[in-house]
């Protein structure tokens, strides 16, 4: 009968198989059971690979949910490739039997020592030799048990890892069927669950389990600080919290007393609780400092000395300051860090702070997020991670700046205002979206579109500073985006060119700020959105104040311009003592060389008979030699007669508006016009023209018609209505009618006499 021994393990059990005989092994391998084509991963494959190791004490078992690293398994034995140095141990001679017994004795001795000192670990060399013997030795003599045999699954060199795993699973199933009648414990305890298997000692006896203790879930376990190799640490800023979560899942669950007694199975790595564990901070470039806050390390490299926050991957030049536990919830992100600091509501706490702040427990939601980030890494973040590393490598080369210098350089102008922001990108807008009543809705939609989809920062297109922290400065009527590291200006926008600005209206969007302006290169309207560390209402208020100031300055400048213009006007209205009124240069003046017969007063202002009688009287009273030569200048408004000998002597000056009648006499060489001098006095001036008076008469006629047109245009519309007819004896009526009649008769006379004068 099989002897049932108690096992002092409350966490889990592990099945360890020993070879019964060579024939049994062959029969097991040739059994009709077909290996499965799929891998059943309900239990950790590392536990199944270690199923051939026999343990006499259940304290050496691991917790059911604590999975050991791949490095804890001898890879050559798992793949069926045994070490050549131990290949002679595979024989069936007596030497092999002796080695098996020696190995069993060593295991029992180790178990007794483990009971005395549960926290003592075996040396790696002894464990490696012991494991090699147990994995490679096969007992040729069968051992009888109480009605049931334990069939081993011996890996062969010619089989692959998958074949070996399939045989191992088949053996486990057959063992479960054979052990059914002889188990002395309950069925629910005998069946191995995920990560569990019944404990079997070397002679085939089954060890019962103690009542299961409450298993610690990942949510209830206390999280320790992340430790990894130096290579992992170098890559840590790139992967961020996901790498920490992966290492946390493998290594950093709170170790139990049973787990602390496990020894390593390989020389490549040590147990998580082993004193031989490789410390990441053993590297000379990483130095521990007890004065630093939890999760911070000091790093020395070619760039200088800086500080690295392990959980978030944040690096900074300044020494971090310890923050009390009650202030963790209100911590602000550091603007001097290379990577973007999260907002206070989304800020993650360091791993070492979870146990203190949460009472030794992890929130289930946080655990699920960490688990999802580890199992399903997001490949779309590779581009952003690459940009982050490039940005970090550039900024770490710069010398650190002091806080005093930063504040002085940013706030050099006392009226300048600076805000910590992070760009979320821009969205193109149409002109009609900025119409009154639509602009606020359009800007809020842009804030929604960019703020909701940028939670994970999927891309860096259109994002100033590749999504990093920066300063938004309002100074000298300019909105500037300044790099917090080297104080370089990433973008500048004149405030007067900003069309619209606004703040997010949705719940939780009070920190989102947006403004709309036209791009100076593409001339398209862009709505730029930023995430602020403080409520964005402060930026909007500052912009409003600056715009009000600009409008007031413009209003004052306009008032000054109007006052100066009025002063100039008042100065121009002062009447000078002497003024010259030049003749308009646009006035057309025609000059004719004629002879002036003289002037004769007449009784009537119009009439050809009056004109002809005046011409005959002047021609008969003087000879042609006595007629002086003069220049007649015919302009639009004036007819002037100037002496040819003395150009400054004006003989006659007649305004066209006072010319009452004109015409050509019976002789085509004679030309005369009647001028109204006022007080019912009229004068008739007579001229002798060569070769005829046609050109002179046409010039004077054109001047009269132009003057008439100007009078019609200058008259207001209300005065264009024909006035009532004047009295019959009115001089005005008679003068107007006679002028028209005289002009028409002159035209008829010229038409009749022109062919005669031109005949030779």
From Swiss-Prot:
Keywords: Endoplasmic reticulum, Endosome, Golgi apparatus, Phosphoprotein, Repeat. It comes from the Eukaryota. The keyword Secreted does not apply. It is found in: Endoplasmic reticulum; Golgi apparatus; Early endosome. InterPro entries: APBB1/2/3, PH-like_dom_sf, PTB/PI_dom, WW_dom, WW_dom_sf. GO terms for biological process: axon guidance; extracellular matrix organization; maintenance of lens transparency; negative regulation of apoptotic process; negative regulation of cell cycle phase transition; negative regulation of transcription by RNA polymerase II; neuron migration; positive regulation of apoptotic process. The keyword Membrane does not apply. Residues 212-230, 261-275 have a biased composition (Polar residues). Expressed in the brain, retinal lens and muscle cells (at protein level). Its main location: endoplasmic reticulum. Interacts (via C-terminus) with APP (via C-terminus). Interacts with APLP2 (via cytoplasmic domain). Plays a role in the maintenance of lens transparency, and may also play a role in muscle cell strength. Involved in hippocampal neurite branching and neuromuscular junction formation, as a result plays a role in spatial memory functioning. Activates transcription of APP. This is Amyloid beta precursor protein binding family B member 2. It comes from Mus musculus (Mouse). The lineage of its organism: Eukaryota, Metazoa, Chordata, Craniata, Vertebrata. The gene is Apbb2.
